[in-house]
Protein backbone atom coordinates (compact mmCIF):
# COMPACT_ATOMS: atom_id res chain seq x y z
CA UNK A 1 0.00 0.00 0.00
CA UNK A 2 1.05 3.60 -0.59
CA UNK A 3 3.10 4.91 2.31
CA UNK A 4 4.20 8.54 2.13
CA UNK A 5 1.63 10.79 0.43
CA UNK A 6 2.25 14.54 0.05
CA UNK A 7 -0.50 16.95 1.05
CA UNK A 8 -1.05 19.69 -1.50
CA UNK A 9 -4.74 20.55 -1.09
CA UNK A 10 -6.97 20.66 1.98
CA UNK A 11 -10.69 21.17 2.47
CA UNK A 12 -11.60 22.73 5.82
CA UNK A 13 -15.21 22.90 7.04
CA UNK A 14 -15.70 23.08 10.79
CA UNK A 15 -18.36 24.04 13.32
CA UNK A 16 -15.89 24.09 16.22
CA UNK A 17 -13.35 26.69 15.11
CA UNK A 18 -10.99 26.33 18.07
CA UNK A 19 -7.44 25.97 16.79
CA UNK A 20 -8.59 26.53 13.20
CA UNK A 21 -6.53 29.62 12.42
CA UNK A 22 -3.29 28.20 13.80
CA UNK A 23 -3.84 25.03 11.77
CA UNK A 24 -4.67 26.92 8.59
CA UNK A 25 -1.65 29.23 8.93
CA UNK A 26 0.63 26.24 9.42
CA UNK A 27 -0.85 24.51 6.36
CA UNK A 28 -0.39 27.67 4.32
CA UNK A 29 3.25 27.83 5.45
CA UNK A 30 3.60 24.28 4.10
CA UNK A 31 2.19 25.56 0.78
CA UNK A 32 -1.06 23.61 1.11
CA UNK A 33 -3.93 25.07 -0.92
CA UNK A 34 -6.96 25.80 1.25
CA UNK A 35 -10.57 25.19 0.21
CA UNK A 36 -13.40 25.99 2.58
CA UNK A 37 -17.11 26.55 3.10
CA UNK A 38 -19.35 29.27 4.54
CA UNK A 39 -18.38 30.47 7.99
CA UNK A 40 -15.08 28.60 7.97
CA UNK A 41 -13.98 30.37 4.78
CA UNK A 42 -15.07 33.71 6.22
CA UNK A 43 -13.00 33.13 9.37
CA UNK A 44 -9.93 32.21 7.31
CA UNK A 45 -10.26 35.28 5.09
CA UNK A 46 -10.74 37.53 8.11
CA UNK A 47 -7.39 36.23 9.35
CA UNK A 48 -5.75 37.19 6.06
CA UNK A 49 -5.44 33.69 4.64
CA UNK A 50 -5.92 32.84 0.99
CA UNK A 51 -8.81 30.41 0.56
CA UNK A 52 -11.01 29.12 -2.27
CA UNK A 53 -14.74 28.75 -1.73
CA UNK A 54 -16.06 25.26 -2.28
CA UNK A 55 -18.61 26.81 -4.65
CA UNK A 56 -15.70 27.83 -6.88
CA UNK A 57 -14.50 24.23 -6.92
CA UNK A 58 -17.91 22.72 -7.64
CA UNK A 59 -19.19 25.45 -9.94
CA UNK A 60 -22.40 25.26 -7.93
CA UNK A 61 -23.48 27.72 -5.24
CA UNK A 62 -24.31 26.79 -1.66
CA UNK A 63 -28.08 26.59 -1.39
CA UNK A 64 -31.06 25.71 0.82
CA UNK A 65 -29.60 27.47 3.87
CA UNK A 66 -26.35 25.58 3.48
CA UNK A 67 -27.96 22.15 3.38
CA UNK A 68 -26.37 21.58 -0.03
CA UNK A 69 -22.79 22.70 -0.51
CA UNK A 70 -20.29 19.81 -0.48
CA UNK A 71 -22.56 17.03 -1.81
CA UNK A 72 -21.03 17.24 -5.27
CA UNK A 73 -18.83 15.00 -7.51
CA UNK A 74 -16.12 17.67 -7.61
CA UNK A 75 -15.72 17.25 -3.85
CA UNK A 76 -16.37 13.54 -3.46
CA UNK A 77 -14.41 12.68 -6.58
CA UNK A 78 -11.44 14.57 -5.13
CA UNK A 79 -11.75 12.60 -1.91
CA UNK A 80 -12.48 9.14 -3.31
CA UNK A 81 -10.25 8.96 -6.38
CA UNK A 82 -7.52 6.32 -6.27
CA UNK A 83 -4.34 8.10 -7.28
CA UNK A 84 -2.77 4.92 -8.66
CA UNK A 85 -5.76 3.88 -10.79
CA UNK A 86 -5.48 5.00 -14.42
CA UNK A 87 -9.26 4.94 -14.97
CA UNK A 88 -9.77 7.19 -11.95
CA UNK A 89 -7.09 9.59 -13.18
CA UNK A 90 -8.65 9.75 -16.64
CA UNK A 91 -12.07 10.48 -15.10
CA UNK A 92 -10.59 13.21 -12.93
CA UNK A 93 -8.92 14.84 -15.92
CA UNK A 94 -12.05 14.58 -18.04
CA UNK A 95 -14.20 16.31 -15.44
CA UNK A 96 -11.65 18.72 -14.03
CA UNK A 97 -11.67 17.07 -10.60
CA UNK A 98 -8.78 18.08 -8.36
CA UNK A 99 -7.50 15.70 -5.68
CA UNK A 100 -8.16 16.61 -2.04
CA UNK A 101 -5.38 15.26 0.17
CA UNK A 102 -6.59 16.49 3.55
CA UNK A 103 -10.10 16.86 4.93
CA UNK A 104 -10.60 18.74 8.19
CA UNK A 105 -14.21 18.51 9.33
CA UNK A 106 -16.05 18.59 12.62
CA UNK A 107 -19.77 18.21 12.62
CA UNK A 108 -22.78 20.36 13.42
CA UNK A 109 -23.14 20.40 17.24
CA UNK A 110 -26.09 18.02 17.37
CA UNK A 111 -25.19 16.57 20.78
CA UNK A 112 -24.96 20.07 22.24
CA UNK A 113 -28.38 20.94 20.84
CA UNK A 114 -29.90 17.89 22.52
CA UNK A 115 -28.09 18.62 25.80
CA UNK A 116 -29.50 22.14 25.98
CA UNK A 117 -33.04 20.85 25.40
CA UNK A 118 -33.47 22.25 21.90
CA UNK A 119 -36.79 21.78 20.12
CA UNK A 120 -37.42 18.89 17.77
CA UNK A 121 -37.05 21.13 14.71
CA UNK A 122 -33.87 22.72 16.04
CA UNK A 123 -32.34 19.30 16.65
CA UNK A 124 -33.23 18.26 13.11
CA UNK A 125 -31.48 21.33 11.72
CA UNK A 126 -28.37 20.40 13.70
CA UNK A 127 -28.06 17.01 11.99
CA UNK A 128 -25.04 17.25 9.69
CA UNK A 129 -25.34 15.58 6.28
CA UNK A 130 -22.48 16.79 4.12
CA UNK A 131 -19.89 16.48 6.89
CA UNK A 132 -20.40 12.77 7.61
CA UNK A 133 -20.55 12.03 3.89
CA UNK A 134 -17.16 13.67 3.31
CA UNK A 135 -15.65 12.07 6.41
CA UNK A 136 -16.69 8.59 5.34
CA UNK A 137 -15.41 9.19 1.81
CA UNK A 138 -12.03 10.43 3.01
CA UNK A 139 -11.71 7.66 5.60
CA UNK A 140 -12.48 5.00 3.01
CA UNK A 141 -9.72 6.40 0.80
CA UNK A 142 -7.15 6.69 3.59
CA UNK A 143 -4.55 5.15 1.30
CA UNK A 144 -4.28 8.65 -0.13
CA UNK A 145 -6.35 11.01 2.03
CA UNK A 146 -5.96 12.32 5.58
CA UNK A 147 -9.18 13.00 7.50
CA UNK A 148 -9.15 14.98 10.74
CA UNK A 149 -12.35 15.11 12.80
CA UNK A 150 -11.04 16.12 16.22
CA UNK A 151 -9.32 19.38 17.13
CA UNK A 152 -7.11 17.32 19.46
CA UNK A 153 -5.43 15.84 16.36
CA UNK A 154 -4.35 19.17 14.82
CA UNK A 155 -0.95 19.15 16.50
CA UNK A 156 -0.27 15.52 15.56
CA UNK A 157 -1.15 16.32 11.94
CA UNK A 158 1.26 19.24 11.78
CA UNK A 159 4.00 17.25 13.51
CA UNK A 160 3.54 14.47 10.95
CA UNK A 161 3.66 16.86 7.99
CA UNK A 162 6.76 18.65 9.27
CA UNK A 163 8.53 15.38 10.01
CA UNK A 164 7.99 14.08 6.47
CA UNK A 165 8.43 17.18 4.28
CA UNK A 166 4.72 17.85 3.87
CA UNK A 167 3.68 14.19 3.55
CA UNK A 168 2.05 11.65 5.86
CA UNK A 169 2.61 7.95 6.45
CA UNK A 170 -0.02 5.30 5.82
CA UNK A 171 -0.01 4.28 9.49
CA UNK A 172 -0.86 7.85 10.45
CA UNK A 173 -3.69 8.05 7.94
CA UNK A 174 -5.07 4.73 9.19
CA UNK A 175 -5.25 6.07 12.74
CA UNK A 176 -7.06 9.16 11.50
CA UNK A 177 -9.50 6.99 9.55
CA UNK A 178 -10.26 4.91 12.63
CA UNK A 179 -11.00 8.05 14.63
CA UNK A 180 -13.15 9.35 11.79
CA UNK A 181 -15.32 6.25 11.52
CA UNK A 182 -15.72 6.16 15.29
CA UNK A 183 -16.85 9.80 15.18
CA UNK A 184 -19.49 9.28 12.50
CA UNK A 185 -20.70 6.15 14.29
CA UNK A 186 -21.03 8.08 17.55
CA UNK A 187 -22.79 10.93 15.75
CA UNK A 188 -25.32 8.61 14.16
CA UNK A 189 -25.80 6.91 17.52
CA UNK A 190 -26.55 10.27 19.12
CA UNK A 191 -29.11 11.06 16.43
CA UNK A 192 -30.83 7.67 16.57
CA UNK A 193 -30.87 7.64 20.38
CA UNK A 194 -32.38 11.12 20.49
CA UNK A 195 -34.98 10.28 17.87
CA UNK A 196 -35.95 7.07 19.64
CA UNK A 197 -36.60 9.12 22.75
CA UNK A 198 -38.37 11.93 20.92
CA UNK A 199 -40.68 9.45 19.20
CA UNK A 200 -41.06 7.35 22.37
CA UNK A 201 -39.85 4.24 20.56
CA UNK A 202 -39.62 1.70 23.38
CA UNK A 203 -37.66 -0.94 21.47
CA UNK A 204 -36.05 0.41 18.28
CA UNK A 205 -35.14 -2.24 15.73
CA UNK A 206 -31.49 -1.32 16.10
CA UNK A 207 -29.83 0.17 19.17
CA UNK A 208 -26.28 1.41 19.50
CA UNK A 209 -24.22 3.08 22.19
CA UNK A 210 -21.20 5.33 21.80
CA UNK A 211 -18.72 7.03 24.08
CA UNK A 212 -15.66 9.24 24.07
CA UNK A 213 -12.46 8.01 25.67
CA UNK A 214 -11.94 9.83 28.95
CA UNK A 215 -9.26 7.70 30.56
CA UNK A 216 -7.17 4.61 29.92
CA UNK A 217 -6.61 2.62 33.08
CA UNK A 218 -3.83 0.50 34.51
CA UNK A 219 -6.28 -2.39 34.59
CA UNK A 220 -9.95 -3.28 35.06
CA UNK A 221 -11.66 -5.06 37.94
CA UNK A 222 -8.56 -7.26 38.19
CA UNK A 223 -4.92 -6.70 37.15
CA UNK A 224 -5.14 -9.12 34.21
CA UNK A 225 -8.02 -7.16 32.62
CA UNK A 226 -7.41 -4.15 30.37
CA UNK A 227 -9.84 -1.26 30.82
CA UNK A 228 -10.79 2.26 29.80
CA UNK A 229 -13.43 4.80 30.81
CA UNK A 230 -15.68 6.39 28.19
CA UNK A 231 -18.11 9.26 28.68
CA UNK A 232 -21.46 9.34 26.88
CA UNK A 233 -21.76 13.11 26.58
CA UNK A 234 -24.72 13.43 28.93
CA UNK A 235 -24.78 16.19 31.52
CA UNK A 236 -25.97 13.96 34.40
CA UNK A 237 -23.87 14.95 37.45
CA UNK A 238 -21.62 12.16 38.61
CA UNK A 239 -18.18 10.69 38.39
CA UNK A 240 -17.97 11.34 34.63
CA UNK A 241 -18.56 15.08 35.03
CA UNK A 242 -16.83 15.57 38.38
CA UNK A 243 -13.78 17.70 39.08
CA UNK A 244 -10.99 15.78 40.81
CA UNK A 245 -9.17 18.00 43.27
CA UNK A 246 -6.49 15.60 44.45
CA UNK A 247 -5.43 11.99 44.74
CA UNK A 248 -4.33 9.29 42.35
CA UNK A 249 -6.08 8.57 39.10
CA UNK A 250 -9.43 6.85 39.56
CA UNK A 251 -9.38 3.10 39.00
CA UNK A 252 -12.05 0.99 37.32
CA UNK A 253 -13.39 -0.12 40.70
CA UNK A 254 -13.22 3.43 42.07
CA UNK A 255 -15.42 4.70 39.25
CA UNK A 256 -17.91 1.85 39.59
CA UNK A 257 -18.22 2.24 43.36
CA UNK A 258 -18.30 6.04 43.28
CA UNK A 259 -21.14 5.97 40.79
CA UNK A 260 -23.10 3.58 43.02
CA UNK A 261 -22.55 5.77 46.08
CA UNK A 262 -23.47 9.05 44.39
CA UNK A 263 -26.61 7.67 42.76
CA UNK A 264 -27.82 6.52 46.18
CA UNK A 265 -27.01 9.70 48.10
CA UNK A 266 -28.85 11.70 45.41
CA UNK A 267 -32.06 10.01 46.57
CA UNK A 268 -31.89 12.12 49.75
CA UNK A 269 -32.98 15.71 49.14
CA UNK A 270 -30.36 18.04 50.65
CA UNK A 271 -33.16 20.46 51.53
CA UNK A 272 -34.39 17.84 54.00
CA UNK A 273 -31.02 17.55 55.69
CA UNK A 274 -27.52 16.11 55.31
CA UNK A 275 -27.03 12.51 54.21
CA UNK A 276 -24.01 10.27 53.80
CA UNK A 277 -23.49 6.99 51.95
CA UNK A 278 -20.51 4.66 52.36
CA UNK A 279 -20.07 2.03 49.65
CA UNK A 280 -17.85 -1.02 49.32
CA UNK A 281 -17.89 -3.20 46.19
CA UNK A 282 -20.89 -1.27 44.82
CA UNK A 283 -23.01 -2.06 47.91
CA UNK A 284 -23.82 0.44 50.64
CA UNK A 285 -22.35 -0.56 54.00
CA UNK A 286 -23.65 2.53 55.78
CA UNK A 287 -26.27 5.18 54.99
CA UNK A 288 -27.53 7.86 57.35
CA UNK A 289 -29.03 11.26 57.81
CA UNK A 290 -27.90 13.60 60.56
CA UNK A 291 -28.36 17.06 62.01
CA UNK A 292 -25.00 17.92 60.43
CA UNK A 293 -22.99 16.35 57.65
CA UNK A 294 -20.40 15.19 60.17
CA UNK A 295 -23.12 13.48 62.20
CA UNK A 296 -24.55 11.82 59.08
CA UNK A 297 -21.08 10.46 58.26
CA UNK A 298 -20.51 9.22 61.82
CA UNK A 299 -23.88 7.43 61.88
CA UNK A 300 -23.26 5.83 58.48
CA UNK A 301 -19.79 4.76 59.62
CA UNK A 302 -21.21 3.13 62.77
CA UNK A 303 -23.34 0.75 60.68
CA UNK A 304 -20.29 -1.25 59.59
CA UNK A 305 -16.94 0.20 60.58
CA UNK A 306 -15.04 -2.80 59.26
CA UNK A 307 -16.41 -2.58 55.72
CA UNK A 308 -16.13 1.22 55.65
CA UNK A 309 -12.33 0.97 55.69
CA UNK A 310 -11.10 1.68 52.16
CA UNK A 311 -14.60 2.57 51.04
CA UNK A 312 -16.21 5.28 48.94
CA UNK A 313 -18.07 8.15 50.62
CA UNK A 314 -20.82 10.17 48.95
CA UNK A 315 -22.42 13.27 50.46
CA UNK A 316 -25.58 15.10 49.44
CA UNK A 317 -24.23 18.47 50.60
CA UNK A 318 -20.87 20.21 50.13
CA UNK A 319 -18.05 18.78 52.23
CA UNK A 320 -17.20 20.92 55.27
CA UNK A 321 -14.19 20.95 57.58
CA UNK A 322 -15.83 19.06 60.46
CA UNK A 323 -16.81 16.19 58.17
CA UNK A 324 -13.42 16.21 56.46
CA UNK A 325 -11.69 15.84 59.84
CA UNK A 326 -13.77 12.77 60.69
CA UNK A 327 -13.27 11.17 57.28
CA UNK A 328 -9.49 11.44 57.51
CA UNK A 329 -9.46 9.33 60.68
CA UNK A 330 -9.50 6.16 58.53
CA UNK A 331 -8.36 5.21 55.05
CA UNK A 332 -10.90 6.16 52.37
CA UNK A 333 -10.50 5.74 48.62
CA UNK A 334 -12.83 8.44 47.25
CA UNK A 335 -15.10 11.20 48.55
CA UNK A 336 -17.67 12.66 46.16
CA UNK A 337 -19.93 15.59 46.98
CA UNK A 338 -21.69 18.49 45.25
CA UNK A 339 -18.91 20.74 46.54
CA UNK A 340 -16.16 21.19 49.13
CA UNK A 341 -15.20 24.32 51.00
CA UNK A 342 -11.63 25.62 51.09
CA UNK A 343 -10.99 24.49 54.67
CA UNK A 344 -12.18 20.95 53.92
CA UNK A 345 -9.93 20.78 50.86
CA UNK A 346 -6.98 21.94 52.95
CA UNK A 347 -7.61 19.14 55.46
CA UNK A 348 -7.77 16.56 52.68
CA UNK A 349 -4.57 17.92 51.13
CA UNK A 350 -2.60 16.17 53.87
CA UNK A 351 -3.96 12.83 52.61
CA UNK A 352 -2.31 12.66 49.20
CA UNK A 353 -3.91 9.37 48.15
CA UNK A 354 -7.45 10.41 49.06
CA UNK A 355 -9.38 11.30 45.93
CA UNK A 356 -11.81 14.22 46.24
CA UNK A 357 -14.45 14.76 43.55
CA UNK A 358 -17.00 17.56 43.32
CA UNK A 359 -19.92 17.80 40.90
CA UNK A 360 -21.72 21.10 41.70
CA UNK A 361 -25.06 19.25 41.67
CA UNK A 362 -26.78 15.96 42.41
CA UNK A 363 -28.27 13.73 39.69
CA UNK A 364 -32.06 13.62 39.53
CA UNK A 365 -33.03 10.15 40.81
CA UNK A 366 -36.37 10.35 38.98
CA UNK A 367 -34.92 11.33 35.59
CA UNK A 368 -35.51 8.80 32.81
CA UNK A 369 -32.55 7.02 31.32
CA UNK A 370 -31.29 3.69 30.08
CA UNK A 371 -29.28 0.92 31.69
CA UNK A 372 -27.69 -1.87 29.71
CA UNK A 373 -25.78 -5.06 30.41
CA UNK A 374 -23.74 -7.13 27.99
CA UNK A 375 -24.46 -10.82 27.68
CA UNK A 376 -23.02 -13.40 25.31
CA UNK A 377 -24.22 -12.50 21.83
CA UNK A 378 -25.98 -9.27 22.75
CA UNK A 379 -26.96 -6.84 25.45
CA UNK A 380 -29.98 -6.18 27.62
CA UNK A 381 -31.47 -2.69 27.66
CA UNK A 382 -33.92 -1.38 30.22
CA UNK A 383 -35.09 1.87 31.77
CA UNK A 384 -32.99 3.11 34.64
CA UNK A 385 -34.64 2.12 37.92
CA UNK A 386 -36.26 5.46 38.76
CA UNK A 387 -39.03 3.82 40.77
CA UNK A 388 -40.15 5.81 43.79
CA UNK A 389 -42.83 5.44 46.45
CA UNK A 390 -44.06 7.75 49.17
CA UNK A 391 -46.34 7.23 52.14
CA UNK A 392 -49.50 7.52 50.05
CA UNK A 393 -48.37 4.61 47.83
CA UNK A 394 -48.07 2.18 50.73
CA UNK A 395 -50.67 -0.42 51.62
CA UNK A 396 -50.89 -1.47 55.26
CA UNK A 397 -51.55 -5.23 55.26
CA UNK A 398 -51.22 -6.06 58.97
CA UNK A 399 -53.49 -5.42 61.92
CA UNK A 400 -51.07 -2.85 63.24
CA UNK A 401 -50.16 0.17 61.14
CA UNK A 402 -46.66 1.61 61.45
CA UNK A 403 -46.14 4.62 63.70
CA UNK A 404 -45.00 7.90 62.16
CA UNK A 405 -41.42 7.19 63.24
CA UNK A 406 -41.55 3.67 61.82
CA UNK A 407 -43.02 4.99 58.58
CA UNK A 408 -40.19 7.48 58.12
CA UNK A 409 -37.63 4.74 58.68
CA UNK A 410 -39.47 2.34 56.37
CA UNK A 411 -39.29 4.82 53.50
CA UNK A 412 -35.61 5.45 54.26
CA UNK A 413 -34.89 1.71 54.29
CA UNK A 414 -36.82 1.21 51.05
CA UNK A 415 -34.71 3.86 49.35
CA UNK A 416 -31.50 2.16 50.45
CA UNK A 417 -32.72 -1.33 49.49
CA UNK A 418 -33.21 -0.11 45.93
CA UNK A 419 -29.43 0.30 45.68
CA UNK A 420 -28.37 -2.97 47.34
CA UNK A 421 -27.57 -6.08 45.29
CA UNK A 422 -30.34 -8.69 45.49
CA UNK A 423 -31.35 -10.39 47.62
CA UNK A 424 -31.34 -7.15 49.62
CA UNK A 425 -32.34 -6.71 53.25
CA UNK A 426 -31.82 -3.40 55.03
CA UNK A 427 -32.33 -2.69 58.75
CA UNK A 428 -32.84 0.99 59.64
CA UNK A 429 -33.31 2.82 62.92
CA UNK A 430 -33.79 6.56 63.41
CA UNK A 431 -32.71 7.48 59.88
CA UNK A 432 -29.60 5.30 59.71
CA UNK A 433 -28.85 1.82 58.47
CA UNK A 434 -27.92 -0.58 61.25
CA UNK A 435 -27.56 -3.71 59.12
CA UNK A 436 -27.28 -4.47 55.40
CA UNK A 437 -27.57 -7.92 53.84
CA UNK A 438 -26.64 -8.03 50.16
CA UNK A 439 -26.21 -10.40 47.27
CA UNK A 440 -27.32 -13.64 48.89
CA UNK A 441 -29.09 -16.37 46.97
CA UNK A 442 -31.81 -16.68 49.63
CA UNK A 443 -33.65 -13.83 51.30
CA UNK A 444 -33.54 -15.38 54.74
CA UNK A 445 -29.73 -15.56 54.54
CA UNK A 446 -29.54 -11.85 53.72
CA UNK A 447 -31.82 -11.17 56.70
CA UNK A 448 -29.67 -13.19 59.08
CA UNK A 449 -26.34 -11.88 57.77
CA UNK A 450 -27.45 -8.27 58.19
CA UNK A 451 -28.61 -8.98 61.74
CA UNK A 452 -25.39 -10.79 62.65
CA UNK A 453 -23.21 -7.98 61.30
CA UNK A 454 -25.30 -5.53 63.30
CA UNK A 455 -24.80 -7.57 66.47
CA UNK A 456 -21.05 -7.64 65.86
CA UNK A 457 -21.03 -3.88 65.42
CA UNK A 458 -23.02 -3.35 68.62
CA UNK A 459 -20.46 -5.40 70.55
CA UNK A 460 -17.60 -3.41 69.02
CA UNK A 461 -19.32 -0.18 70.08
CA UNK A 462 -19.89 -1.52 73.59
CA UNK A 463 -23.67 -1.38 73.35
CA UNK A 464 -25.90 -3.40 75.65
CA UNK A 465 -28.33 -4.50 72.93
CA UNK A 466 -28.19 -5.14 69.18
CA UNK A 467 -28.51 -2.15 66.88
CA UNK A 468 -31.41 -3.91 65.18
CA UNK A 469 -33.54 -3.76 68.34
CA UNK A 470 -36.46 -1.46 67.49
CA UNK A 471 -35.44 -1.18 63.85
CA UNK A 472 -37.47 -1.54 60.66
CA UNK A 473 -36.62 -3.73 57.67
CA UNK A 474 -36.85 -3.27 53.91
CA UNK A 475 -36.77 -6.16 51.46
CA UNK A 476 -36.20 -5.39 47.77
CA UNK A 477 -38.57 -8.19 46.75
CA UNK A 478 -41.32 -10.16 48.44
CA UNK A 479 -40.71 -12.71 51.16
CA UNK A 480 -41.46 -16.07 49.50
CA UNK A 481 -41.86 -17.63 52.94
CA UNK A 482 -42.34 -16.34 56.45
CA UNK A 483 -38.84 -17.40 57.54
CA UNK A 484 -37.13 -14.17 56.47
CA UNK A 485 -39.70 -12.02 58.20
CA UNK A 486 -39.46 -14.10 61.38
CA UNK A 487 -35.66 -13.78 61.30
CA UNK A 488 -36.09 -10.00 61.15
CA UNK A 489 -38.52 -10.08 64.07
CA UNK A 490 -36.09 -12.23 66.06
CA UNK A 491 -33.41 -9.59 65.45
CA UNK A 492 -35.69 -6.96 67.00
CA UNK A 493 -37.37 -5.41 63.96
CA UNK A 494 -40.83 -3.91 64.54
CA UNK A 495 -41.96 -3.08 61.01
CA UNK A 496 -41.43 -4.37 57.47
CA UNK A 497 -41.64 -2.80 54.01
CA UNK A 498 -41.70 -5.06 50.97
CA UNK A 499 -43.33 -5.21 47.53
CA UNK A 500 -45.78 -8.02 48.27
CA UNK A 501 -46.96 -10.31 45.51
CA UNK A 502 -45.91 -13.70 46.83
CA UNK A 503 -48.20 -16.71 46.51
CA UNK A 504 -47.76 -16.97 50.29
CA UNK A 505 -48.50 -13.34 51.17
CA UNK A 506 -51.32 -14.47 53.47
CA UNK A 507 -48.92 -16.73 55.36
CA UNK A 508 -46.34 -13.95 55.67
CA UNK A 509 -48.97 -11.42 56.81
CA UNK A 510 -50.28 -13.86 59.41
CA UNK A 511 -46.75 -14.38 60.72
CA UNK A 512 -46.28 -10.61 60.94
CA UNK A 513 -49.51 -10.22 62.89
CA UNK A 514 -48.55 -12.99 65.26
CA UNK A 515 -45.18 -11.34 65.87
CA UNK A 516 -46.83 -7.93 66.40
CA UNK A 517 -45.12 -6.41 63.38
CA UNK A 518 -46.48 -3.65 61.20
CA UNK A 519 -46.04 -4.38 57.49
CA UNK A 520 -46.66 -2.34 54.35
CA UNK A 521 -46.59 -3.33 50.69
CA UNK A 522 -45.17 -1.02 48.02
CA UNK A 523 -46.40 -2.89 44.96
CA UNK A 524 -42.99 -2.20 43.43
CA UNK A 525 -39.89 -4.39 43.29
CA UNK A 526 -36.24 -3.33 43.20
CA UNK A 527 -34.18 -6.30 42.02
CA UNK A 528 -30.57 -5.29 41.39
CA UNK A 529 -28.07 -7.66 39.83
Curated annotation (Swiss-Prot):
GO terms for biological process: 'de novo' IMP biosynthetic process. Keywords: Hydrolase, Multifunctional enzyme, Purine biosynthesis, Transferase. It catalyses: (6R)-10-formyltetrahydrofolate + 5-amino-1-(5-phospho-beta-D-ribosyl)imidazole-4-carboxamide = 5-formamido-1-(5-phospho-D-ribosyl)imidazole-4-carboxamide + (6S)-5,6,7,8-tetrahydrofolate; IMP + H2O = 5-formamido-1-(5-phospho-D-ribosyl)imidazole-4-carboxamide. GO terms for molecular function: IMP cyclohydrolase activity; phosphoribosylaminoimidazolecarboxamide formyltransferase activity. Pathway: Purine metabolism; IMP biosynthesis via de novo pathway; 5-formamido-1-(5-phospho-D-ribosyl)imidazole-4-carboxamide from 5-amino-1-(5-phospho-D-ribosyl)imidazole-4-carboxamide (10-formyl THF route): step 1/1; Purine metabolism; IMP biosynthesis via de novo pathway; IMP from 5-formamido-1-(5-phospho-D-ribosyl)imidazole-4-carboxamide: step 1/1. SMART domains: AICARFT_IMPCHas (SM00798), MGS (SM00851). InterPro entries: AICAR_Tfase_dup_dom_sf (IPR024051), Cytidine_deaminase-like (IPR016193), MGS-like_dom (IPR011607), MGS-like_dom_sf (IPR036914), PurH-like (IPR002695). Disulfide bonds: none annotated. GO terms for cellular component: cytosol. The keyword Transferase applies. Its EC number is 2.1.2.3, 3.5.4.10. Residues 2-149 form the MGS-like domain. Belongs to the PurH family. The IMP cyclohydrolase activity resides in the N-terminal region. This is Bifunctional purine biosynthesis protein PurH.
Amino acid sequence: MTNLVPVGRALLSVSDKSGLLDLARALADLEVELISTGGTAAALRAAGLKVRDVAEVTGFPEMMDGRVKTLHPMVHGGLLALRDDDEHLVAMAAHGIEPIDLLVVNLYPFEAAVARGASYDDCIENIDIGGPAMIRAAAKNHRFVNVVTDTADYKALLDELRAHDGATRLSFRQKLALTAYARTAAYDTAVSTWMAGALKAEAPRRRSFAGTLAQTMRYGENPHQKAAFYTDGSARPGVATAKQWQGKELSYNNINDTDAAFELVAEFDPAEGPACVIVKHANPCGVARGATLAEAYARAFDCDRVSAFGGIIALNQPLDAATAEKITEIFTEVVIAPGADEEARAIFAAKKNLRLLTTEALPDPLAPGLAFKQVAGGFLVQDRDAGHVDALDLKVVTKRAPSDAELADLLFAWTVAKHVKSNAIVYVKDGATVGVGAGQMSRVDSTRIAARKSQDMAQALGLAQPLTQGSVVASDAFFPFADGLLAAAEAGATAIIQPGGSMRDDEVIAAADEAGLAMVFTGQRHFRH
